[in-house]
Every structure is written in C-alpha cells, then in structure tokens.
Amino acid sequence: MAKSSLSLNWSLLVLLNFLGATLSTGTDSLSCELTFNHRTLHGQCSVNGKTLLDFGDKKHEGNATEMCADLSQSLRELSEGMRNQQSGNDALNVTTQSQYNQGEFIGGFWAINTDEQHSIYFYPLNMTWRESHSDNSSAMEHWKNKNLEKDIRNVLIIYFSRCLNKLSPHFREMPKSKIKVLDTTQNTNTTQIHPTVNNSQHNSDTQGLSFTWIVIICIGGIVSFMAFMVFAWCMLKKKKGALCCSSSSTT
C-alpha cells in the first residue's frame, strides 16, 4: 500500500512539473506595422507589446535589428519585391499579426492595405488569400504570386521564429515600447483590420490556449485513471485478505 502510494505521488509530481512547464511557456503574440516607401522601410514589430524591431530608430531601446540581421534583411528584400509588384509609387502599408508557441509559428496573417478602407490577407499556414471586401477581389488577384507567397511564409514561419528563439527569454524582460502605434482613426493609408477577418485572427490567437486546455484535460484524465487503478488494487488486496481470514477462522 505504501509502495503504491509513493508511486502515485511520484507520477503526480512528474505530471504537475510537465503541466507547469507547458503553462509557463505560453504563446508569443507578434504584431508589425510597416510602411514600404521607395528604397526605404519604416515601422516596427513588437512581441507581447514590447519592441522587437524598429526600422525608424536604430538606437531605440530593445531594437533587435542587428541581433536578428537575417530577419531584417529578409524583410527588406520582401519589401523590395512587393514594391516591384505594386502598381504606382504610393507608400505601401503592411500589417502582420501572428502567434508563436515556444518560437514555433501556430497562426497569423500578412495584411496588405489596398486603399484607406480595404485590405487583403495572406495566411501562410494554408497559403491562402482573403479580401476584406468583395470589391477587393481584383486587387487580391494582382498580389497572388508564388514567389511573394513563399517570401512572406519564410519571413513569418522561419525568420521570425529564429529571432524569437535567439532572443528568448531575455527579450521578454525588455521595457515596453513607448512609441505610439500608428493612428488608424486618421484619414491615412494605415492598414485597417476589419471585423470579418478579426474572427479568423481570433481563432488563430486562441490555438495556444486550446492546446493548454487539451494538455490539462489529458493530464487530469491520466491522474484520475491512475488513482482509480490504485484504489481498485487496494480494494482487491483488502478483499483477498478478508477471504483469507474468513477461511482460517472456518478451519
């Protein structure tokens, strides 16, 4: 009985340690507000509300453009490729929002602002495009390009993941950015995220939370099963002992 109780306690300790490690890692939320002008890239990217990259101020505290040089370079090359595909010379505004679990991309999108009110969205996990409005279908077809899709996918899934893994965990301790996010209420070309697409983003944002609950439920089921097995074993031993005593007294 004492041996089985010790075994159960040890198993519970292992499971709780695993659960604690899972919950403590959580997910990282990445967001970028970028503007592609002629030969220049402006804007910043933040993780969990803290500045990760700032292309407008190299001296900004917490800026990791040098530590994540491959990411910075890939973003600049991507901006050049997008400008080459763009019709006209207007500034191109891009917004991206994505989620990472222990540095691994689990969901998100890359949004291209087509005018003051509409955007088109690329989802790298399933390599699909969506428009915020049906009138944007022609603009979406214009941006569909295999090389562009591959470059966006590499930036979000490969280069951002490498940067997060390289800077984790100390980048989470950096002070929060004091730079204001671009004002989307003004009449500018800033990318606007529409409610119809926010639902999709919300689904990807909650994937990490769903994973955590799945782990909790599985661990709870394992613990309950182990407790039941120990209880059944103890009851069986007790029943056998009672039968032995009964047969001895009869004899």
From Swiss-Prot:
Glycans are attached at N63, N93, N126, N189. SUPFAM superfamilies: MHC antigen-recognition domain. Induction: Up-regulated in response to infection by murine cytomegalovirus. Keywords: Cell membrane, Glycoprotein, Immunity, Membrane, Signal, Transmembrane, Transmembrane helix. GO terms for biological process: natural killer cell mediated cytotoxicity. Residues 25-212 are extracellular. In strain C57BL/6J, strongly expressed in cardiac muscle and skeletal muscle, with lower expression levels in spleen, liver, kidney and thymus. In strain BALB/cJ, weakly expressed in cardiac muscle, spleen, kidney and thymus. The chain crosses the membrane at residues 213-233. It comes from the Eukaryota. It is found in: Cell membrane. InterPro entries: MHC_I-like_Ag-recog_sf, MHC_I/II-like_Ag-recog. The keyword Ubl conjugation does not apply. Residues 1-24 form the signal peptide. Residues 234-251 are cytoplasmic. This is Histocompatibility antigen 60b. It comes from Mus musculus (Mouse).
